[in-house]
Each structure stands twice: as structure tokens, then as C-alpha cells.
């Protein structure tokens, strides 16, 4: 994934110094675009180790509509712990917005079910969109959505996905985000009997935290390996029934991990 290293280099060279919510400070560029052809490999970075099971479990957690960290903690994943309350809740974040968007007139909308229905029944629709940016719920969320909106597009039985991410922690968060939405695209393509096409990522405030600069400079010196291949072992009856063991990542060769602290 040379494109990821190109982004790191751009931020290190051209990024603007900005203050931020965490108090750490960032180097930031605004407006960035990358495309990944999912037919050519699964876009999980190889210039440091990424924990694929954590990516899978977080996505399955979103798809469950869950907003409590217990499921993640039960699978030894603690990435959401800093924002949870004493009971483990995070407020109406991604999972609730994806699966249970509440309307003013009392309806509850399952956006994931809706997009799958549209892909199957009206693949030419320009409305195959999921949003996590529920303005009326933002004040109740422990952490506001960073990856806020994604859209699917079907051409010649091929499924494409585009994500808009308003705020992006490039060193720690972006590798997870790219892999997570690429995995979701594979899953929905399988459910809808389509082939996978491109995953397109668009970022707003795209930044390196200043306590990640040293690590980024180390990473850009590494040479990427060939991308791994994703194999899905079975087709569940619906997208909400996938399990970790349904996914095999073949030939994932990677450089050693690079430790960095998350900005809270």
C-alpha cells in the first residue's frame, strides 16, 4: 500500500500545525482521496502489523448495533475503553446509527438492512447511503463519528464503496478504517451476489498527531509487501450473522509493529 506511505510523507512535508481537542496537536492536510481495487488484494497495510481479528470484531460489533464495550472486551479488544462510561456504554455511536436510527415521529430505521435491500432491488439507485452523523444525537455520543458517511454504487454486477471521513488519525486509525470498510464491502457483495470493485476513501481533516511523528518517519522507510487475499469461508443467511472464523486472510506478510499512544 504505497498510497498510504505517500499520504504519510505528504503530511510530514506539507501538514499545517493545528491545535486539537486532545491538546496534543497535529500536522494536518485538508481534503485527501485514495482508491483501492479490492480485486487486486485486501488493503491491510504491511509496513507494520495490523491486528486483523480486532478489525473484524469491531465491524461485527457495529453490525450488531451494539454500543457497549463488553463484546469487544470479551474478545480482548480495548480500543474503545477510554471513552466508555462506568457501565461500558458509549452512547448512540456507529452501531446504533447504522441499525437503529430513531426518527422524530417514532420510527426506527435499520440503514444496513435498507442498503442491502436497495442493492438487491434497485442497484442503480443513487441513495444507497449510510450516515452516522445524526445531529440530534451528537451530544449524547462519547466520541463523535469520524467516518461519517458511506455510499455504495453498483455497475455491471460489481459493488463499489466510497467513505467520507471528516477526521482521520492517519497513523493509528486509518489502517483500521480502510480495512474495515473494505471488509464490509466484501461482505455486502457476497450477500448480494456481486463482485467487489473499488473502495474509495475521502478524508476531511487528515492528520498525524505530534506524538506519532517519530513513528511515521520510521514507517515511511519500510518497503511494502504484496497485499494479502481475503477469503470468506461461508455465506451466512444475513449480514448480521458473520463470525470471526468466517474470514481468512491469506499471505499477510508484514513488518514489525510500531507502538504509538492513542490521543484521547
From Swiss-Prot:
Active-site annotation: 146
Pathway: Pyrimidine metabolism; dTTP biosynthesis
Catalytic reaction equation(s): dUMP + (6R)-5,10-methylene-5,6,7,8-tetrahydrofolate = 7,8-dihydrofolate + dTMP
Chain ranges passing through the membrane: none
UniProt keywords, alphabetically: Cytoplasm, Methyltransferase, Nucleotide biosynthesis, Transferase
Entry binding sites for dUMP: 21, 126-127, 166-169, 177, 207-209
Annotated compartments: Cytoplasm
PANTHER family documented for this protein: THYMIDYLATE SYNTHASE, THYMIDYLATE SYNTHASE 1
Protein name, per record: Thymidylate synthase
Source organism of the structure: Buchnera aphidicola subsp. Baizongia pistaciae (strain Bp)
Lineage: Bacteria, Pseudomonadati, Pseudomonadota, Gammaproteobacteria, Enterobacterales
Name of the gene this protein is made from: thyA
Amino acid at each position: 500500500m504505497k498510497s498510504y506511505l505517500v499520504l504519510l510523507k505528504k503530511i510530514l512535508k506539507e501538514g499545517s500545525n493545528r491545535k486539537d481537542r486532545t491538546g496534543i496537536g497535529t500536522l494536518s492536510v485538508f481534503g485527501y482521496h485514495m482508491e483501492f481495487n479490492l480485486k487486486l488484494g485486501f488493503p491491510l497495510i504491511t509496513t507494520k502489523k495490523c491486528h486483523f481479528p480486532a478489525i473484524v470484531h469491531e465491524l461485527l460489533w457495529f453490525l450488531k448495533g451494539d454500543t457497549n464495550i463488553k463484546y469487544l472486551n470479551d474478545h480482548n479488544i480495548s480500543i474503545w475503553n477510554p471513552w466508555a462510561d462506568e457501565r461500558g456504554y458509549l452512547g448512540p455511536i456507529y452501531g446504533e446509527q447504522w441499525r437503529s436510527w430513531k426518527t422524530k415521529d417514532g420510527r426506527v430505521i435499520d440503514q444496513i438492512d435498507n442498503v442491502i435491500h436497495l442493492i438487491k432491488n434497485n442497484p442503480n439507485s443513487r441513495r444507497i447511503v449510510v450516515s452516522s452523523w445524526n445531529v440530534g444525537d451528537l451530544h449524547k455520543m462519547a466520541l463523535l463519528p469520524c467516518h461519517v458517511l458511506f455510499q455504495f454504487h453498483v455497475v455491471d454486477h460489481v459493488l463499489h464503496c466510497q467513505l467520507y471521513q471528516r477526521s482521520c488519525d492517519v497513523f493509528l486509525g486509518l489502517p483500521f478504517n480502510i480495512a474495515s470498510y473494505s471488509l464490509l464491502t466484501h461482505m455486502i457483495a457476497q450477500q448480494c451476489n456481486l463482485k467487489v470493485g473499488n473502495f474509495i476513501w475521502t478524508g476531511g481533516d487528515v492528520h498525524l498527531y505530534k506524538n506519532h511523528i517519530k513513528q511515521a518517519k520510521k514507517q515511511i522507510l519500510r518497503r511494502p509487501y504484496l497485499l494479502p487475499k481475503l477469503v470468506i469461508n461461508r455465506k451466512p443467511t444475513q449480514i448480521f450473522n458473520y463470525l470471526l472464523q468466517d474470514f481468512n486472510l491469506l499471505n499477510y506478510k508484514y513488518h514489525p509493529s510500531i507502538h504509538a499512544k492513542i490521543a484521547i
